[in-house]
């Protein structure tokens, strides 16, 4: 039961954040909806990481390249959760 509630809350937050709500609004929802503890910390971390993701780069690497081709005519590289145009990964 508790696991189902967590999954439902998480999916609800993802849906809300994808329809134009900013990260701080979703964080406030987590703060009031989830009791203090490890679960709240985990959900806040997940919301923060999802909020920082640009152009779906971890899920679909080609999207970042398409974005950079459109705006700068350069090759796009996924650096963690951010797209960088013309800056290759330097390991």
From Swiss-Prot:
Q: Quote the tissue specificity entry.
A: Expressed by the venom gland.
Which residue ranges make up the pro-region? 20-27
**Where is the protein situated, by its record's location annotation?**
Secreted
Signal peptide boundaries: 1-19
Disulfide connectivity? 57-78, 64-83, 68-85
GO terms, molecular function: potassium channel regulator activity; toxin activity
What domain of life does the native source organism fall in? Eukaryota
One GO CC term of this entry?
A: extracellular region
- This protein's major location comes to secreted
Q: Which InterPro entries match?
A: Long_scorpion_toxin_alpha/beta
Q: Which family does it belong to?
A: Belongs to the long chain scorpion toxin family. Class 1 subfamily.
Q: How does it assemble?
A: Monomer (both chains).
- Write down what this protein is called: Potassium channel toxin AaTXK-beta
Native source species: Androctonus australis
């Amino acid at each position: 039961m508790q696991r189902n509630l967590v999954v439902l809350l998480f999916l609800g937050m993802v849906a809300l954040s994808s329809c134009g709500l900013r990260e701080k609004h979703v964080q406030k929802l987590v703060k009031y909806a989830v009791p203090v503890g490890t679960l709240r910390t985990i959900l806040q971390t997940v919301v923060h990481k999802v909020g920082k993701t640009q152009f779906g780069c971890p899920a679909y690497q080609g999207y970042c390249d398409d974005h950079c081709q459109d705006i700068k005519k350069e090759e796009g590289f996924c650096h963690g959760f951010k797209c960088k145009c013309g800056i290759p990964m330097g390991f």
